[in-house]
Structure formats: C-alpha cells, structure tokens
Amino acid sequence: MSKRAKKRDKLMVEIVQVYSASRDEEQVTDLKKTDYLPYLFNLVMPKQFYKSPNRIVMARLYPDVQKHDEQAAEYFEGFQTPCFDLPTNLFPEKAPIDKIVFMPKVMLPMGFEAGGVFGPGVLPRRCYPVDLISPDHKGPMPPLFVGLRGMNVSLSSMINTFLGMYDSSDGQEPHVYEMHATNHHYKNDLAPEELMLRPDFTLSVAYTLPASMCLPSPYPYPSVPAQDNIYTPDLSKVLILMPHQFNITVAILSTVNNPHDPSVAFATMGDDEDCPEFELPSDVFPICEGVNRPIFLPKRFMPKGFDACCVFKPGSLSELWYIKSIGRFGNPQDQYNCFITPPLFVGKYTRNAASINMLEEISVHFDQKDREIAKSLARLRLDALRLNSRNNTTKGFLVMESDKPTTPAGAYSVESYEKASEDGCIAKVTQECATKSTDTRDDGMNTADYQSQFPELEQDSEPEPEPEPEPQTEDEGEDEDIEILASLCSGSI
C-alpha cells in the first residue's frame, strides 16, 4: 500500500517497485479515448529512485487525489504519446497489459520520458503488485502508474529540498511499524501493568545478536523485493528477553533482523525434521487457517530455552488484535513493510531446564566481538607498519639506453627522460658518439636542455676531450640506436 505526503503542493509516493528496461527514442503510440487520464506532473518519486540504475517504476495512485482530467483527455485524444515495452516480469501471465493508457509527456511526473496508467478496476487483484496493496483491501483495484524515468534527470533545488525531507530508498529500507492512533476504548481493554503481567502469556523482547565481523563480498547482491506470502525465520541466534518466566510468551519479530530463511521453510515441509507443536490459547489467539496459520519451527531453529515455538507471518494478525492483546507497549522492531502488521513469535518456555542468564550471554557475545575487532585492528596496524617499512627503504632507479628491441628482465620501458624523472630516476648512463651536445632526441627535446634541468648530474671538473672515434663497422653503427629503459636496482646509487 502506498503512502503519500503533501508539501508545497507536491504529492509524493514513498512505496514503489522499481525495475530495469530500455526504450527506443522514437517509440510512440496514439492516445485513444480514455476514462482515466490524471495530471501527474506534481507526483514526486522517492529520492532513491532518481539515483537508481533501474528506470521503471510502478506506483499506486489514488482516484480522489490524482483525479481524471476530462479536458486533457479530450484535448490529447488522437495525439502521439511516448510509450515503451513493458517487461514480461512486471505482471503475471494473461494480465491485461494492453489496457495501459500512455500519457502525454506534459502530464508525466518530473524526470519521466514515458509512462502510462491502468485505470481504477482495470487490473484484477491477482495482477496487482502485492507490495502496493493491503491484504485486506476490498473493492476494485486502485489505479496504477507505470513509468520510465529519463537517463539524466535534473531536479530543481526546491524539489531536492522536498525530497530530502521525505528521503526514502527502495522497499528494502527499514521502517518501524506504528499502530494508528485511536481514541476508542474497547470493552476488555487492559491497563499497561495488566498487559505486561497478564495471566495467560507474557510479553517479551526478541533480541538478535549482531552478526560477526566479516569482509564485504566483492559480488553485490541484488535488491530482493519483500514478499510476505510465507515467513519462516531462523531464530537459533535470537535471545527472548522475558520480564518474568511464564509458560507462553510472545514477542514482535523484525523482518529486517529476522528475515525469511528458505532453508527453514524446506525443513518445516519435510518429514525428517521434528517440529514440536502446542495448543495456542483460543481465548487469546484467533483461529487462523490457510496462509495465515502459525508455522511451527524445527528444534534447531528455535531460540534457546523453548520446547516449541511458532511464528505468525506479517499481516496474518489484525491491528485490532495487537491493540487489544499487546497494546502499544510492544518493543518496536524494524520492518521492510510498515503497512501491514509485523510478524509475531509465540513460544512455549522450557520449565524443567535451568533458566538462561540472557544478559550474561549478551555480555559474553559482545566481549567476543570486541576481541575479534581488536585482532582485526592489530592485523591492520601490522600491515600498515609493513607497508611503511617497505616504503622507507631507499631504492635507486637507473636509466639505461640500449639497442635491444626487447626490454630486459627486471626493467620496464619509459617514453622519455621526463617520465623516468617522474618515476624517481636519479642517474643516467648513456652511450654517445662524438656529436654535438645539442643533438635532438626522438622526443623532440635537446640533450643540452635536458641536462640543464639536472645540474647535479654534471661533473665538477671540465670534461676530458673525447678521443676520436675509431672507424666502426656497419654493425657497430647500428648499436647507436637507443631505446630508453628504466631498471630497478637493489640498492641506492
């Protein structure tokens, strides 16, 4: 279900679904007569969508907010509007995707190059995105906008400020579920103290131990859209903090800290795992059947100190049940989807076993994590010291001129003396004939000009006159062709 906020006459969609696609720039279609064509220029998407590499977005619309513009529908009838091919993974098979109405560009939201709408009731319930509609929605399906964002989007400073106030990433950003405010008091409402110390069950807190420190993977994981059709988390590393020991306890779980684990789901479906069950109090828990029934977990996926436990998936229990049974005093947990009720843990406490000191176990866990972090920091410091020790060793570079066509082992070729100087060359060995000192090299720079830049290479005394060159054969004359090489020596020169 979408959420909208109004600020400075700008409407914003906070819950959307994003996909990737491409479009031909000249792809257009004719706008036919339609019963629903809203003006969506003021519809602003979340800030993260404008930065995402995925360019297609699906957003729920509200007919009472994004109303049909009858004058625009009559005026643009017959006009050519930009369109694009809908990806096959957007909708299930036999979905009426041909009923989409592509809109004129002036009516699209800012930053979109093409887009269309499905009018109210056009899409059947099975074809509507499950994350954009409440599970208990009744009546015809609301309109749906499907748009393709442009490659380069430039938003005004006012819009950027507005997006900063309502910044939200894709459907994977954690939120905290909050119950709706109400002044209504029910007949059997309990006081806060009675809710915490009620005789049928106790309200606990699910504490998930932080994961061990590990290096990030070089392979990025794609963002998986949240689904609430089944929910079977691994609770073996979860500590259930109870205010007092009782036979049955409940705790709100987090879809962020306690995500769905497919291996747990397969274990519950097989015959090899033992999934102990117990009877839930009928005066407390409603009778949930089908997909909303509680799932009993195998023993190896249970929290410590429990004989049996089960979980209610997100949205299976009504908000009214949470208000009457738990009240507003449940520990808030991060959720991926805050428009349905959070998942619930129900466990049967082990009476015969010794109680577990949860606080001591948490302290031991954090002490272990501190030791791991200290070892990692010590390893990083050692690597840094080794790197500095290698960098502090003085090494000389030698520039040689050779006639060999291939670079010798342990050397690498440079383009010019300037490049050798940039690499740290401090000496030059050359073989020259009795020619003028202003001979021009292949790189266009005079030798005298280069030597003037490095006076430290000049001799203090007057150079002795070079002997007259002996007559050389044709083969020896070819040795005068030079190639600039740089070789790394073991010590300083």
From Swiss-Prot:
Cysteines paired by S-S bonds: none
Origin: domain of life: Eukaryota
Compositional bias annotation for Acidic residues: 457-483
Annotated InterPro entries: DM7 (IPR006610)
TM annotation in the entry: none
Region (Disordered): 434-493
Sorted UniProt keywords: Repeat
Family: Belongs to the DM7 family.
Descriptive protein name: DM7 family protein GM11958
Species, as recorded: Drosophila sechellia (Fruit fly)
